[in-house]
Every structure is written in C-alpha cells, then in structure tokens.
C-alpha cells in the first residue's frame, strides 16, 4: 500500500524522542518516501514556512510544547495539511478527542506495529486528496485500540 497515488510522499515527523524520529525517518525512506524530522516542536513554524510536506506526524507529549497546541497552530498555518498523531499515550479517549478537535486527521498509538501507522498514513493522505477533489469529507482515521 502506498500513501498516495504517486511513488512517494513527503512527511514531517515532530517527536522529541530522537530514537523514534530516526526510526520513522528510516522506515518511511525505506518505503521510498522523503522525510524530515524535528525533535523540537518550536522549530515547526520556521520549517513549514520554508518547506513543503504532505503529511505531518506529531507526538502529543513533548517537553517544550504541548502536542495539542502544536496541532492547533499547524492547522492555522496550513488548514489542508494532513496531521496524524503518533503517541505513546496509547488509546486515551480524552487525548484522542482533544487532538481531533485541534485538527488532527488520525490518531495512532506507538504501541501498535509500525505497519499500522503506515496504513493510517495511507488512509489519511488518500482522504485528504479526495477532499481536495471536492469529495465529501470522511471521518478521522483512528488506530489506537490494541
């Protein structure tokens, strides 16, 4: 399964854990995509103003910036950017709903296999591409229950 109709997609990962960020970058690059990681959420605005990406993957719990606030900020900056939460919080219904209200398009627990995240990325990207073609919006994609 490919996250878009093209051969590759451009991803931005925002996670304060350098090990997780590196793992995701490596995984997505092995799948043929371009990928950049930020381990400091405060870098997001300047990065997005200078670069393009098709999907952002955001951690909820970071020491310097709250993931929910970051999602809201990103949504204001780019209303059409697909945002997927990838969090170690697990399936926390309150956090999930807060992320979705802030503008996230999907929610995945870090406790699930990486292939699950990839499937959610593919579905979110496909849904967002359909929206751009004026297809009625679909529900957010959730994969937090283990």
What are these regions (language model features)?
Residues 21, 63:
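The feature encodes the CheY-like receiver
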Residues 37-55:
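Acidic, metal-coordinating helix/loop segments flanking the phosphotransfer/catalytic sites
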Residues 39-40, 66-69:
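Acidic catalytic/metal-coordinating carboxylates
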Residues 46, 68-80:
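Short amphipathic alpha-helix used as the core "switch/output" element in two-component signaling
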Residues 59:
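Active-site residues of response regulator receiver
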Residues 69, 90-106:
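Alpha4 helix (beta4-alpha4-beta5 surface) of REC/receiver domains from two-component response regulators
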Residues 86-87:
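Hydrophobic/aromatic residues positioned on beta-strands within the core alpha/beta folds
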Residues 94-95, 112-122:
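C-terminal output helix
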């Amino acid at each position: 399964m490919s996250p878009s109709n093209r051969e590759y997609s451009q991803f931005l990962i925002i996670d304060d854990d350098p090990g997780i960020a590196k793992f995701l970058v490596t995984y997505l690059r092995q799948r043929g995509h371009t990928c950049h990681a930020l381990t400091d959420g405060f870098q997001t605005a300047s990065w997005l103003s200078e670069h393009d990406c098709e999907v952002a993957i955001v951690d909820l719990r970071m020491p310097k910036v709250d993931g929910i606030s970051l999602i809201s900020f990103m949504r204001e900056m780019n209303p059409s950017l697909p945002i997927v939460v990838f969090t170690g919080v697990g399936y926390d219904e309150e956090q999930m709903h807060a992320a979705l209200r802030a503008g996230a398009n999907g929610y995945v627990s870090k406790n699930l296999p990486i292939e699950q995240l990839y499937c959610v990325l593919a579905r979110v990207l496909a849904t967002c591409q359909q929206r751009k073609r004026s297809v009625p919006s679909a529900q957010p994609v959730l994969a937090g229950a283990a």
